[in-house]
Amino acid sequence: MSGTLYLVATPIGNLGDFSPRAVETLENADFIAAEDTRVSIKLLNHFNIKKPLVSYHEHNHVSAGQAILARLLAGESCALVTDAGTPAVSDPGEDLVRLCAENGVRVLSIPGCCAAVNALAVSGLPTGRFTFEGFLTVNKKSRREHLDSLRGERRTMIFHEAPHKLAATLADLRDTFGPDRQIALCRELTKLHEETRRTTLGEAADYYAANPPKGEFVLVVAGAQQETGAVVTLEEGVEQVLALREQGMRLKDAAREVAEHTGLSKNELYTAALNR
Protein backbone atom coordinates (compact mmCIF):
# COMPACT_ATOMS: atom_id res chain seq x y z
CA MET A 1 0.00 0.00 0.00
CA SER A 2 1.34 3.43 -0.92
CA GLY A 3 2.10 6.10 1.63
CA THR A 4 0.63 9.59 1.94
CA LEU A 5 1.85 12.98 0.78
CA TYR A 6 1.03 15.67 3.36
CA LEU A 7 0.95 19.30 2.24
CA VAL A 8 1.96 21.16 5.38
CA ALA A 9 1.44 24.92 5.40
CA THR A 10 4.23 26.79 7.18
CA PRO A 11 4.27 30.25 8.84
CA ILE A 12 4.64 33.27 6.56
CA GLY A 13 6.49 35.23 9.23
CA ASN A 14 5.31 34.34 12.73
CA LEU A 15 6.28 30.92 14.10
CA GLY A 16 3.37 31.15 16.53
CA ASP A 17 1.05 30.48 13.59
CA PHE A 18 2.34 26.90 13.15
CA SER A 19 -0.40 24.55 14.34
CA PRO A 20 -0.05 21.57 16.71
CA ARG A 21 -1.42 19.34 13.94
CA ALA A 22 1.27 20.57 11.55
CA VAL A 23 3.97 19.82 14.13
CA GLU A 24 2.52 16.35 14.71
CA THR A 25 2.42 15.66 10.97
CA LEU A 26 6.09 16.56 10.53
CA GLU A 27 7.02 14.44 13.54
CA ASN A 28 5.19 11.40 12.16
CA ALA A 29 6.26 11.65 8.52
CA ASP A 30 9.02 9.32 7.32
CA PHE A 31 10.75 12.22 5.60
CA ILE A 32 10.22 15.88 4.72
CA ALA A 33 10.53 17.43 1.25
CA ALA A 34 11.52 21.09 1.48
CA GLU A 35 11.78 23.96 -0.99
CA ASP A 36 14.97 25.17 0.72
CA THR A 37 16.39 22.84 3.36
CA ARG A 38 18.36 25.71 4.92
CA VAL A 39 15.11 27.57 5.63
CA SER A 40 13.13 24.53 6.75
CA ILE A 41 15.81 23.31 9.17
CA LYS A 42 15.29 26.49 11.20
CA LEU A 43 11.58 25.68 11.53
CA LEU A 44 12.32 22.07 12.46
CA ASN A 45 14.92 23.06 15.04
CA HIS A 46 12.51 25.56 16.62
CA PHE A 47 9.99 22.76 17.22
CA ASN A 48 12.69 20.15 17.96
CA ILE A 49 11.68 17.96 15.01
CA LYS A 50 14.32 15.48 13.84
CA LYS A 51 13.46 14.06 10.43
CA PRO A 52 15.37 13.38 7.20
CA LEU A 53 15.15 16.25 4.72
CA VAL A 54 15.19 16.05 0.93
CA SER A 55 15.26 18.98 -1.47
CA TYR A 56 12.32 19.65 -3.79
CA HIS A 57 12.21 22.96 -5.67
CA GLU A 58 11.69 24.60 -9.05
CA HIS A 59 15.06 23.54 -10.46
CA ASN A 60 15.00 19.84 -9.49
CA HIS A 61 11.28 19.06 -9.30
CA VAL A 62 11.32 16.54 -12.17
CA SER A 63 14.03 14.24 -10.80
CA ALA A 64 13.21 14.89 -7.14
CA GLY A 65 9.52 14.32 -7.81
CA GLN A 66 10.19 10.88 -9.25
CA ALA A 67 12.40 9.97 -6.30
CA ILE A 68 9.76 11.10 -3.80
CA LEU A 69 7.04 9.24 -5.72
CA ALA A 70 9.06 6.03 -5.61
CA ARG A 71 9.35 6.26 -1.83
CA LEU A 72 5.64 7.01 -1.49
CA LEU A 73 4.74 4.02 -3.66
CA ALA A 74 6.98 1.91 -1.43
CA GLY A 75 4.81 2.87 1.55
CA GLU A 76 6.66 5.82 3.10
CA SER A 77 4.91 9.06 4.08
CA CYS A 78 6.23 12.47 3.04
CA ALA A 79 5.51 15.96 4.37
CA LEU A 80 5.95 18.64 1.72
CA VAL A 81 6.78 22.14 2.97
CA THR A 82 7.58 25.41 1.25
CA ASP A 83 9.66 28.26 2.67
CA ALA A 84 6.49 30.09 3.73
CA GLY A 85 2.81 29.43 3.18
CA THR A 86 0.88 26.61 1.57
CA PRO A 87 2.71 24.12 -0.67
CA ALA A 88 1.45 23.59 -4.24
CA VAL A 89 -0.18 27.05 -4.44
CA SER A 90 1.84 29.11 -6.93
CA ASP A 91 4.58 26.63 -6.09
CA PRO A 92 6.37 23.65 -7.74
CA GLY A 93 4.55 21.40 -5.29
CA GLU A 94 1.62 21.39 -7.70
CA ASP A 95 3.64 19.12 -10.00
CA LEU A 96 4.27 16.64 -7.19
CA VAL A 97 0.58 16.62 -6.27
CA ARG A 98 -0.32 15.94 -9.90
CA LEU A 99 2.24 13.14 -10.05
CA CYS A 100 0.82 11.55 -6.92
CA ALA A 101 -2.76 11.88 -8.18
CA GLU A 102 -1.82 10.19 -11.45
CA ASN A 103 -0.25 7.29 -9.56
CA GLY A 104 -2.95 6.76 -6.95
CA VAL A 105 -1.01 8.19 -4.00
CA ARG A 106 -3.12 9.74 -1.27
CA VAL A 107 -2.63 13.51 -0.80
CA LEU A 108 -3.79 15.34 2.33
CA SER A 109 -3.64 19.05 3.17
CA ILE A 110 -2.61 20.29 6.61
CA PRO A 111 -3.99 23.84 6.48
CA GLY A 112 -2.35 26.97 7.78
CA CYS A 113 -1.05 30.29 6.53
CA CYS A 114 -1.74 31.61 3.05
CA ALA A 115 -0.47 35.13 2.34
CA ALA A 116 -2.98 35.73 -0.46
CA VAL A 117 -6.01 34.95 1.70
CA ASN A 118 -4.65 36.91 4.67
CA ALA A 119 -4.05 39.95 2.45
CA LEU A 120 -7.51 39.69 0.93
CA ALA A 121 -9.08 39.56 4.39
CA VAL A 122 -7.42 42.79 5.58
CA SER A 123 -7.61 44.65 2.25
CA GLY A 124 -11.03 46.21 2.74
CA LEU A 125 -11.89 45.24 -0.85
CA PRO A 126 -14.67 42.82 -1.92
CA THR A 127 -13.87 39.25 -0.88
CA GLY A 128 -16.85 37.35 -2.31
CA ARG A 129 -15.13 36.65 -5.63
CA PHE A 130 -11.41 36.96 -6.30
CA THR A 131 -8.68 35.70 -8.59
CA PHE A 132 -5.14 34.83 -7.51
CA GLU A 133 -2.57 35.83 -10.14
CA GLY A 134 0.65 35.02 -8.25
CA PHE A 135 3.90 36.64 -9.39
CA LEU A 136 3.93 38.49 -12.71
CA THR A 137 6.63 37.35 -15.11
CA VAL A 138 9.71 39.53 -15.60
CA ASN A 139 9.32 39.20 -19.38
CA LYS A 140 7.90 42.57 -20.42
CA LYS A 141 5.78 41.30 -23.33
CA SER A 142 4.29 38.37 -21.40
CA ARG A 143 3.71 40.60 -18.40
CA ARG A 144 1.71 43.13 -20.43
CA GLU A 145 -0.28 40.36 -22.12
CA HIS A 146 -1.13 38.92 -18.70
CA LEU A 147 -2.33 42.27 -17.40
CA ASP A 148 -4.18 43.06 -20.61
CA SER A 149 -6.15 39.82 -20.21
CA LEU A 150 -7.35 41.15 -16.83
CA ARG A 151 -8.46 44.54 -18.13
CA GLY A 152 -12.17 43.74 -17.77
CA GLU A 153 -11.82 41.46 -14.70
CA ARG A 154 -14.52 42.32 -12.18
CA ARG A 155 -13.24 40.11 -9.37
CA THR A 156 -10.72 41.34 -6.81
CA MET A 157 -7.21 40.47 -8.02
CA ILE A 158 -4.31 39.28 -5.85
CA PHE A 159 -0.64 39.47 -6.85
CA HIS A 160 2.62 38.61 -5.08
CA GLU A 161 5.61 40.89 -5.61
CA ALA A 162 9.19 41.25 -4.43
CA PRO A 163 10.39 44.68 -3.24
CA HIS A 164 12.89 45.22 -6.06
CA LYS A 165 10.16 44.82 -8.70
CA LEU A 166 7.34 46.62 -6.87
CA ALA A 167 7.69 50.07 -8.47
CA ALA A 168 7.68 48.66 -12.01
CA THR A 169 4.72 46.42 -11.25
CA LEU A 170 2.69 49.29 -9.79
CA ALA A 171 3.42 51.39 -12.87
CA ASP A 172 2.20 48.57 -15.11
CA LEU A 173 -0.93 48.08 -13.00
CA ARG A 174 -1.65 51.81 -13.13
CA ASP A 175 -1.18 51.92 -16.90
CA THR A 176 -3.48 48.92 -17.36
CA PHE A 177 -6.29 49.64 -14.90
CA GLY A 178 -6.02 53.42 -14.55
CA PRO A 179 -4.66 55.62 -11.73
CA ASP A 180 -7.94 55.73 -9.78
CA ARG A 181 -8.29 51.95 -9.25
CA GLN A 182 -8.19 50.97 -5.56
CA ILE A 183 -5.35 48.84 -4.20
CA ALA A 184 -4.28 47.47 -0.83
CA LEU A 185 -0.54 46.87 -0.45
CA CYS A 186 0.10 44.35 2.32
CA ARG A 187 3.72 44.25 3.48
CA GLU A 188 5.45 41.80 5.82
CA LEU A 189 2.23 39.99 6.78
CA THR A 190 2.27 38.50 10.32
CA LYS A 191 5.75 39.97 10.97
CA LEU A 192 6.83 42.71 13.37
CA HIS A 193 6.57 45.49 10.78
CA GLU A 194 3.32 44.34 9.14
CA GLU A 195 1.63 47.16 7.24
CA THR A 196 -1.39 47.55 4.96
CA ARG A 197 -1.53 50.65 2.77
CA ARG A 198 -4.92 51.32 1.14
CA THR A 199 -4.79 53.81 -1.72
CA THR A 200 -5.06 54.14 -5.51
CA LEU A 201 -2.78 52.69 -8.16
CA GLY A 202 -1.70 56.18 -9.21
CA GLU A 203 -0.73 57.24 -5.70
CA ALA A 204 0.95 53.92 -4.95
CA ALA A 205 3.02 54.02 -8.14
CA ASP A 206 4.19 57.57 -7.40
CA TYR A 207 4.97 56.83 -3.74
CA TYR A 208 7.05 53.71 -4.28
CA ALA A 209 8.86 55.20 -7.27
CA ALA A 210 10.22 57.78 -4.81
CA ASN A 211 10.47 55.54 -1.73
CA PRO A 212 12.26 52.22 -2.29
CA PRO A 213 10.22 49.52 -0.51
CA LYS A 214 11.40 46.87 1.92
CA GLY A 215 9.88 43.47 2.59
CA GLU A 216 7.62 41.12 0.65
CA PHE A 217 4.32 42.44 -0.70
CA VAL A 218 0.90 41.07 -1.51
CA LEU A 219 -1.07 43.41 -3.77
CA VAL A 220 -4.86 43.31 -3.67
CA VAL A 221 -6.40 45.23 -6.57
CA ALA A 222 -10.08 46.09 -6.94
CA GLY A 223 -11.86 44.59 -9.93
CA ALA A 224 -13.38 46.62 -12.74
CA GLN A 225 -16.69 48.32 -12.05
CA GLN A 226 -19.67 47.04 -13.98
CA GLU A 227 -20.48 49.43 -16.78
CA THR A 228 -23.93 50.97 -16.59
CA GLY A 229 -24.06 51.52 -20.34
CA ALA A 230 -24.46 48.98 -23.10
CA VAL A 231 -21.88 46.18 -23.32
CA VAL A 232 -19.63 46.49 -26.36
CA THR A 233 -19.15 43.25 -28.28
CA LEU A 234 -15.85 42.25 -29.85
CA GLU A 235 -17.29 42.90 -33.31
CA GLU A 236 -18.38 46.40 -32.30
CA GLY A 237 -14.96 47.00 -30.76
CA VAL A 238 -13.26 45.95 -33.99
CA GLU A 239 -15.40 48.43 -35.92
CA GLN A 240 -14.21 51.17 -33.55
CA VAL A 241 -10.60 50.11 -34.10
CA LEU A 242 -11.01 50.20 -37.88
CA ALA A 243 -12.63 53.63 -37.68
CA LEU A 244 -9.60 54.95 -35.79
CA ARG A 245 -7.32 53.32 -38.36
CA GLU A 246 -9.10 55.24 -41.12
CA GLN A 247 -8.32 58.42 -39.19
CA GLY A 248 -4.62 57.60 -39.44
CA MET A 249 -3.99 55.91 -36.07
CA ARG A 250 -1.69 52.89 -35.95
CA LEU A 251 -3.52 49.58 -35.49
CA LYS A 252 -1.70 48.83 -32.23
CA ASP A 253 -2.57 52.24 -30.78
CA ALA A 254 -6.17 52.01 -31.97
CA ALA A 255 -6.61 48.60 -30.32
CA ARG A 256 -5.17 49.94 -27.07
CA GLU A 257 -7.46 52.99 -27.05
CA VAL A 258 -10.61 50.95 -27.72
CA ALA A 259 -9.58 48.41 -25.07
CA GLU A 260 -9.24 51.18 -22.48
CA HIS A 261 -12.76 52.45 -23.15
CA THR A 262 -14.57 49.12 -23.55
CA GLY A 263 -12.80 46.66 -21.27
CA LEU A 264 -12.20 44.36 -24.25
CA SER A 265 -8.86 42.63 -24.69
CA LYS A 266 -6.34 44.69 -26.63
CA ASN A 267 -4.81 41.54 -28.13
CA GLU A 268 -8.17 40.17 -29.26
CA LEU A 269 -9.09 43.51 -30.82
CA TYR A 270 -5.73 43.74 -32.58
CA THR A 271 -5.89 40.19 -33.95
CA ALA A 272 -9.50 40.46 -35.08
CA ALA A 273 -8.89 43.81 -36.78
CA LEU A 274 -5.74 42.48 -38.45
CA ASN A 275 -7.72 39.60 -39.96
CA ARG A 276 -10.42 41.86 -41.41
Residue ranges with predicted function:
Residues 1-58:
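Glycine-rich, flexible N-terminal cofactor/catalytic loop recognition
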Residues 26-32, 104-108, 156-157:
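Short active-site oxyanion
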Residues 92-94, 251:
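Glycine-centered tight-turn and secondary-structure capping sites
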Residues 55-63, 136-140:
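Conserved helicase motor
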Residues 3-5, 74-79, 155-156:
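Loop/turn-to-beta-strand initiation segments
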Residues 2, 156, 163-276:
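A contiguous loop/helix-start segment that scaffolds small-molecule binding in enzyme catalytic cores
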Residues 34, 109-112, 159, 185:
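General beta-strand structural signal in soluble alpha/beta enzymes
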